[in-house]
Design a protein with these regions (language model features):
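Accessory carbohydrate-recognition regions in carbohydrate-active enzymes
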Residues: 26-361, 365-408, 414-471, 479, ...
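ATP-dependent phospho-/nucleotidyl transfer catalytic cores
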Residues: 476
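Bacterial N-terminal signal peptides that target proteins for export
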Residues: 2-11
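Extracellular attachment/recognition segments
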Residues: 707
Length: 759
């Protein structure tokens, strides 16, 4: 009996070991991605404000099922009952909305165009959602719809019922559109001009649809009216309907491509599908996603964490969007969203630097530097074509958010060693943006005249977010100074930016120990409350913004009275009740998101405070950073439709998770340092583009064991609270011993603290 028991026990242990090994072997990371994360959102409360993006990494065109009405920024919401079509979209956020969009929708047994009448019930149980493939059953039409993308094209596979009235509806949307049906070629061409700003007057998205089945019926539509046998339509709201007789289970393929340049270029872009079956396109998309995701090789047996990690990595690799095309001679060209001309070179768009300078672009510099090299080329072109670097591009300059954070994006890329573009043009661009403003946009600096003269933007001169702008401009000046120093520019040219980098001190109120709005006479706001979401700040309050001194935490610490006072102030963020400040202005979704998360005044759903917990590394309490980073990852992220605690914001909030799961974060882009948090996984390998590998191992890591007991780098004990870019680029092995009890003797010496400008 004992022998039998021993054999059974041994077999059980071996089975568990085999299961664990199987769980650790992640061969296809794309299988862990859920594109539905963040889609359970609404105007009042964001859990991401995303849509299921069916696309390739950084693709020019995205595709998504459309549940919202035409023009609704919430194009797909998880709880919606009906699908209205499958939309080519370029939307970065519901707040920015879309441009150049159009929708196609298969219908059966009824001739309809209206979006409400053509809409069909569907179920998530009959929906398959992958980054490279989407499939759904349209119950009202008895049609199965499938789509698979390339960078600028997509292929659809529609399985129709038995009927003589199978149709495909093309809706080119309102605000100016055109369609032409070419029956002899089984083709539809047209364009959409719909946009919400940021485009030249000649903006068009030209499209072409190629069918593999002849049409038995053709019709156009104009503002909802159907015109049978008509093949061409232009006007405010044009559309097309083509029909065919189908057997049950008959498949119709539709190839779709578009171009911002011309019809001819759209036809060239359609060549991305030449010689490929639908399954080929699916397989290619799967391979592309696996290739990019596998550069971060995670080994762990917590499947929930794996799903959350790779789903966030997927979101990190979507924006900025490619906005360039390849001409007939194989040359890179782009339609300029700034001057309307067709010009050579790269262009990227649909990113707001206010969000993404923080860690999205630093992440690209670490893991995908060749892609960011192209993006820097795109910034050179944007400057040459408009006279300014964009701060929020969609597709051209938009008037949204604050700061001149393009300076950080440029500086961080160059400091991290990215080369091969016109850095001198970008140097001139960041200097120009620091001393000018492009009217009607966020580009340059609003209030630069006051800032340059007084050292801050006053709160009584009609400029909103004045205190927040002051803090950002000080950091932006530091970024310019750092770039200039790296370029070897003379002190006479860069000294002014060095001096202005300390301007954050000008709005610090020692009585409040917080940043406070200030008049042009030097008087602090007498009605100030730290929890008020006032007009002196941007989408937050002083508790969120007072720690936004990325480049000089030590200087901020000195203002607050030293390490102890600094730590008390940070601790207070999590203690002050989240309901405080909710009556300070009309409710906005960022306020509600902070309130309901029950983490005090910590508002991870918005960007200004996302770095704050890492600041404990500067104040000799790194174990608190370890505690709070893991708490945020565990509590505020998952791989479900309610994945986020606020807007995902074009990769920024996702990149925060990806970086934090690796165990470090870029508190101050423009330095070469990554500030430590706590690793989430047992083992990670980063396969760098230069062929080197970063290996991160965390022994005894678990839900409870979130604290770093010991740390070794290349076999040697390591007490610093940061790693350098150079260390990582050379290839490195990082070994942690994790524990449930904080080690309060590690990383507490002055030499262990990360970079501060005023040291």
């Amino acid at each position: 009996m004992k022998t039998a028991y021993f054999i059974k026990r041994t077999l059980l242990v071996c089975s568990v070991m085999m299961y664990s090994l199987h769980a650790l072997a992640i061969k296809n990371p794309v299988d862990y991605v859920n594109p539905l994360i963040g889609t359970d959102s609404k105007y009042e409360l964001s859990t991401g404000n995303t849509y299921p993006t069916i696309a390739l990494p950084w693709g020019m065109n995205f595709w998504t099922p459309q549940t919202g009405k035409m023009g609704d920024g919430w194009t797909y919401t998880y709880k919606a009952d009906k699908i209205r079509g499958f939309k080519q979209t370029h939307q970065p956020s519901p707040w920015m909305n879309d441009y150049g969009q159009f929708t196609i929708m298969p219908v059966a047994d009824k001739l309809v165009f209206d979006e409400d009448k053509r809409a069909s019930w569907y179920s998530h149980k009959a929906e398959v959602v992958k980054p490279y493939f989407y499939k759904v059953y349209l119950a009202d039409h008895d049609i199965t719809a499938e789509m698979a993308p390339t960078e600028r094209a997509a292929m659809f596979r529609f399985t129709y019922p038995e009927t003589k009235e199978s149709y495909l509806v093309l809706d080119a949307f309102d605000r100016g559109s055109y369609v032409k049906i070419i029956p002899e070629e089984n083709k539809i061409i047209g364009y959409s001009t719909r946009n919400t700003g940021g485009v030249p007057e000649n903006f068009k998205n030209y499209f072409v649809l190629q069918f593999d089945k002849p049409f038995t019926f053709v019709s156009t539509a104009s503002s909802g009216d159907i015109h049978p046998n008509k093949t061409e339509e232009s006007g405010k709201h044009a559309g097309a309907i083509v029909g065919f007789s189908t057997r049950r289970g008959e498949v119709v393929h539709v190839k779709v491509a578009s171009s911002f340049i011309s019809y001819e270029q759209a036809e060239l872009n359609l060549n991305e599908l030449t010689g490929k079956s639908f399954d080929d396109v699916v397989a290619n998309g799967r391979n592309v996603w696996n290739r990019e995701l596998a550069k971060l090789e995670v080994n762990d047996d917590n499947i929930d964490n794996l799903r959350t990690f790779y789903s966030n990595l997927y979101r990190t690799l979507l924006f900025p969007r490619s906005f360039y095309e390849i001409d007939k001679d194989g040359k890179v060209m782009h339609y300029s969203p700034y001057n309307g001309e067709v010009l050579p070179g790269y262009m990227f768009t649909d990113t707001g630097f206010w969000d993404t300078f923080r860690c999205l672009f630093p992440f690209l510099n670490l893991m995908y530097p060749s892609m960011n090299q192209k993006m820097q080329e795109g910034l050179v072109n944007a400057y040459k074509e408009s006279g300014f670097l964009p701060e929020w591009a969609s597709p051209g300059h938009r008037d949204c958010m604050i700061g001149q954070n393009s300076a950080s994006v440029v500086a961080d890329a160059y400091v991290k060693g990215i080369r091969g573009y016109d850095i001198e043009a970008l140097w001139e661009a960041v200097k120009h943006g620091a001393n000018a403003h492009l009217k009607g946009s966020a580009s340059g600096r609003v209030g630069y005249e006051y800032y340059n003269k007084l050292g801050y933007v006053p709160n009584n001169v009609g400029i909103r977010s004045n205190a927040a702008r002051t803090l950002e401009y000080a950091f932006n000046d530091w970024s310019i100074y750092t770039l200039g120093k790296k370029l070897g520019k003379p002190e006479s040219e860069i000294a002014v930016y060095k001096e202005r980098a300390m301007n954050y001190r000008n709005i610090y109120n020692p009585e409040r120990k917080l940043m406070v709005g200030k008049s042009d006479k030097g008087v602090f706001n007498p009605n100030f409350k730290g929890t008020d979401w006032s007009r002196d700040f941007c989408e937050g309050n002083s508790w969120h913004w007072s720690f936004c001194v990325f480049h000089d935490p030590q200087g901020l610490m000195n203002l607050m009275g030293g390490q102890d006072e600094f730590n008390v102030m940070m601790d207070s963020v999590f203690v002050i009740p989240s309901k405080m400040g909710m009556d300070s202005r009309g409710m906005i979704h960022e306020m509600r998101e902070m309130q309901v998360m029950n983490m005090g005044q910590y508002a991870h759903g918005n960007q200004p405070i996302q770095h704050m917990v890492y600041l404990y590394n500067y104040s000799a309490q790194p174990w608190k950073a370890q505690y709070w980073v893991r708490e945020i990852m565990n509590k505020l992220y998952n791989a479900a439709p309610d994945a986020y605690c606020g807007d995902e914001d074009n990769g920024q909030t996702s990149a925060w998770y990806v970086f934090s799961a690796l165990g470090f974060y870029t508190v101050c882009p423009g330095t070469d340092q990554y500030v430590l948090g706590t690793p989430l996984f047992k083992s990670v390998k980063l396969h760098l583009e230069n062929g080197k590998t970063v290996t991160i191992e965390a022994a005894n890591n678990s839900f409870e064991n979130r604290y770093i007991k010991t740390m070794k780098v290349n076999g040697k004990n390591y007490t610093r609270n940061y790693l350098t870019h150079d260390q990582l680029m050379k290839g490195i092995k990082i070994q942690y011993q994790m524990d449930a009890v904080p080690n309060k003797m590690r990383g507490i010496n002055e030499a262990d603290a990360p970079y501060s400008f005023s040291e």
